[in-house]
């Protein structure tokens, strides 16, 4: 720092003053050399003396300029070093300020994280004036207050209590062997008011029908006889006497079906059973050995059509052969395909000759 101060206050100003003094001295030397050269009789000697003064003056000026430039560069270096020192001090001060701020922040965070002990006191404070309580009043329950809410349903308890049985629409008759027949549904008799036939007056057919009807009615109804109604008596065993005609009082009820109605209808004699069908006639040996004739083969085929080929095709686009073994054709030409290859090419015969052609140029002939 002292060196920088010495350069700024002494060395550089002295060098500048020396340059100003040399400037005035060089002007006087120039005037002297000019007068001496004009007044001298020996011009050559005067010229040599002038050259010597000039060389000395230039050397003196160069030395002073170099000395001043060196002092100036030295001053700039010292100022740069001082500036770097100041910058380092400022950076250090900034780091110290940041450290101080971080310490303060940590201290504040520590104060927030400390356990705060509240002074002990009464936590629950009872109110000074309690609200008045409503006196209890018993009210009867209203069980019909929600009757108008929701979807209503029909109450069937009264109807069920009247009839004592389920409705006929909800009854599904099971397929029992006693009542089921082939081709016609079982007949369900009335559940009440069954006619009573005198003993010994029931034939085998009516006895069988009564047993079947009673079994089907019990299986279909699925419910026992209601209280207060007596079950009809069981029919007696059939006798050898012929059944009498039904009395007049029974005419109001439906006539029970006979045995012919309960029995399944006889099979149609015109239609034979599947087991009685005659076996098909054997095929001839010629039909089994010969393959089907090729499509489109007939006596009116042109002469160029081969004896056997795969199919006939019609060209969609014209094609010109690129090789000697290829076919050339125009649009609408008929070709008999004799062989197909996996690469899409086909071999066939046309009216022009035999050769190969692309398979995507043709379509099957109708």
Curated annotation (Swiss-Prot):
GO biological process terms, semicolon-separated: actin cytoskeleton organization; cell projection morphogenesis; defense response to tumor cell; modification of postsynaptic actin cytoskeleton; negative regulation of lamellipodium assembly; negative regulation of protein localization to plasma membrane; negative regulation of ruffle assembly; neuron migration
Pfam families to which the protein is assigned, alphabetical: Abi_HHR, SH3_9
Subcellular location: Cytoplasm
Coiled coil: 33-61
GO CC annotations, alphabetized: actin-based cell projection; cytoplasm; dendritic shaft; dendritic spine; glutamatergic synapse; lamellipodium; membrane; postsynaptic density
Domain SH3 residue range list: 308-366
SMART domains: SH3 (SM00326)
Keywords linked to the UniProt accession: Coiled coil, Cytoplasm, Phosphoprotein, SH3 domain
Region (Disordered): 161-195, 215-302
Residues modified to Phosphoserine: 213, 216, 342
Family named by the database record: Belongs to the ABI family.
Task of the protein: May inhibit tumor metastasis. In vitro, reduces cell motility.
Protein name: ABI gene family member 3
Lineage, highest ranks first: Eukaryota, Metazoa, Chordata, Craniata, Vertebrata
């Amino acid at each position: 720092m002292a060196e920088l101060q010495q350069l700024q206050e002494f060395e550089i100003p002295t060098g500048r003053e020396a340059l100003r003094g040399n400037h005035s001295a060089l002007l006087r030397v120039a005037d002297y050399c000019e007068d001496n050269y004009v007044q001298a009789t020996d011009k050559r000697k005067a010229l040599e003396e002038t050259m010597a003064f000039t060389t000395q003056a230039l050397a003196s000026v160069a030395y002073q300029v170099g000395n001043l430039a060196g002092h100036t560069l030295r001053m700039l270096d010292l100022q740069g070093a001082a500036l770097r020192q100041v910058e380092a001090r400022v950076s250090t001060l900034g780091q110290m300020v940041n450290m101080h701020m971080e310490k303060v922040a940590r201290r504040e965070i520590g104060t927030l994280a400390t356990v705060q002990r509240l002074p002990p006191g009464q936590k629950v404070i009872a109110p000074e004036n309690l609200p008045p309580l409503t006196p209890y009043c018993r009210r009867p329950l209203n069980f019909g207050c929600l009757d108008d809410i929701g979807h209503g349903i029909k109450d069937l308890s009264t109807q069920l209590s009247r009839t004592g049985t389920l409705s006929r629409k909800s009854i599904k008759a099971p397929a029992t062997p006693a009542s089921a027949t082939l081709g016609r549904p079982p007949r369900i008799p009335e559940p009440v008011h069954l006619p009573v036939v005198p003993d010994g007056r029931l034939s085998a057919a009516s006895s069988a029908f009564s047993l079947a009807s009673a079994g089907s009615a019990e299986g279909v109804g699925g419910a026992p006889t209601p209280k207060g109604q007596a079950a009809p008596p069981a029919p007696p065993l059939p006798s050898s006497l012929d059944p009498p005609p039904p009395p007049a009082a029974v005419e109001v009820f439906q006539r029970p079906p006979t045995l012919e109605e309960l029995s399944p209808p006889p099979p149609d004699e015109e239609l034979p059973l599947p087991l009685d069908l005659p076996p098909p006639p054997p095929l001839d040996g010629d039909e089994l050995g010969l393959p089907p004739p090729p499509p489109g083969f007939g006596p009116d085929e042109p002469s160029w059509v081969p004896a056997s080929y795969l199919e006939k095709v019609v060209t969609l686009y014209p094609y010109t052969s690129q090789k000697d073994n290829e076919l050339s054709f125009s649009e609408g030409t008929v070709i008999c395909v004799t062989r197909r290859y996996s690469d899409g090419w086909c071999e066939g015969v046309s009216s022009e000759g035999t050769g190969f052609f692309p398979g995507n140029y043709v379509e099957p002939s109708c």
